């Protein structure tokens, strides 16, 4: 499984170890546990081959449903890696994604993409299609986003891991890559965000020609806002939750 993951740029996403005695037991106990696990997927209720909802994305929707409930049940804020569909839909409509006409040439970017739910909803509101770009700091959440894209058949989505403010992954030469549309739900009031970005930002997010100033070090909201502005094309549109 690890080799398959690496071949598809999903290294570190699949961490299941079916030889782990501490989790599965030993000998007959392990065999029984694995047999029960396989039996779950043999349940006839999971056979969707005769389902008449041919156009529904059952697997993808089920995956998002599980992520939403995991966030709630685990006590983590859903905003950490999941944006509710209703909020995502409003953001997509606000920036006019329904008017995008250039197909895959249209670019949509989320600088703090989490599990990718906001990007996928933006794509749903773009009838002509688009190319998705996302960056996420947490490596495990990047895995969730990549799986989410695959399950929703967005195989061309470009999801990368890294600190968006201090290590932006989408660049053109020595400048930030710019996009047609940006949607974002960055972490609220991030503390100690100022690292390699420093006071003289090499991407001129804190001002070029007109000095804007460095955002407060103990509150990263403004830093994400300036990153979004700098990552927009001159004719671009953006919506964010701050």
How should each PLM-predicted stretch be described?
Residues 91, 214-242:
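Conserved Class I SAM-dependent methyltransferase catalytic core
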Residues 204-212:
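A short, charged helix-loop
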Residues 1, 212-214:
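Extracellular loop and loop/strand-boundary signature of outer-membrane beta-barrel proteins
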Residues 27, 52, 134-138, 181, ...:
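Hydrophobic alpha-helical scaffolding
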Residues 1-99, 160-169:
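Non-catalytic, mostly N-terminal accessory regions of nucleic-acid modification and defense proteins
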Residues 77-184, 189-200, 209, 242:
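Conserved S-adenosyl-L-methionine
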């Amino acid at each position: 499984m690890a080799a398959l993951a690496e071949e598809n740029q999903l290294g570190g996403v699949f961490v299941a170890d079916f030889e782990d005695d501490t989790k599965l037991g030993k000998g007959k106990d392990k065999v029984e546990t694995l047999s029960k696990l396989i039996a779950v997927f043999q349940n006839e209720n999971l056979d969707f081959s005769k389902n008449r909802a041919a156009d529904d994305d059952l697997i993808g929707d089920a995956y998002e449903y599980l992520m939403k409930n995991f966030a709630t049940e685990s006590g983590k804020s859903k905003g950490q890696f999941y944006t509710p569909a209703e909020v995502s839909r409003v953001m997509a409509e606000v920036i006019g994604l329904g008017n995008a006409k250039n197909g895959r040439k249209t670019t949509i970017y989320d600088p703090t993409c989490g599990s990718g739910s906001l990007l996928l909803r933006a794509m749903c509101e773009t009838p002509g299609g688009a190319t998705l770009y996302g960056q996420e700091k947490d490596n495990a959440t990047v895995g969730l986003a990549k799986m989410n894209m695959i399950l929703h058949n967005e195989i061309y989505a470009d999801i990368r891991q890294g600190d968006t403010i201090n290590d932006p992954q989408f660049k053109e030469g020595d400048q930030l890559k710019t996009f047609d549309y940006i949607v974002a739900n960055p972490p609220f009031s991030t503390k100690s965000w100022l690292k390699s970005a420093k006071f003289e930002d090499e991407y001129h997010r804190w001002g070029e020609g007109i000095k804007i100033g460095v955002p407060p070090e103990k509150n990263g909201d403004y830093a994400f806002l300036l990153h979004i502005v700098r990552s927009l094309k001159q004719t671009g549109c953006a919506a964010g939750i701050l």
